[in-house]
Amino acid sequence: MNNFAKISCLAWAVVIIACLPLNAGTSTQEKAFTDKYKAAFEGKDTATLESFLYTQGADPAILGFYKMMQSGEAGEKISTIELVNLTPDDAKKAVTPMDSPTGGKICLTLKPTKKLIIKVEKKDANGSSTSTSESFIAEKDGKFVIPVPGPCK
């Protein structure tokens, strides 16, 4: 091998090794987020659930709705919880203005990078039911948050 090839191989090896912790940190951060969310949800810890909401610039009426939806099934057992990458359709949907129930158009206040998918299964004497909820997830100041829509800018 000539010197250029050796240096190139060494440089690529250094780059690859340097990037490995970035992926590990991300998956660790994702697991910490889903574990904390699941514990708060199953423990009916509404204060912690609300701490996941990114409320800066949010429409107050929509914020109230988000809090209600978040706590509606709180206390139930989560059968699966996962944080997944956005599909191209999800990414398009996330940036598309929506009609506000209070009039006008609303948009997410942060650009989402992931989607939280939660499946809750309930069983009782009358049978069983399954519900699935999805929330867009963004990153703000190094932590995952659920952006609450507000007026479009």
Predicted regions and their residues:
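Positively charged n-region of N-terminal signal peptides that target proteins for export
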Residues: 1-7
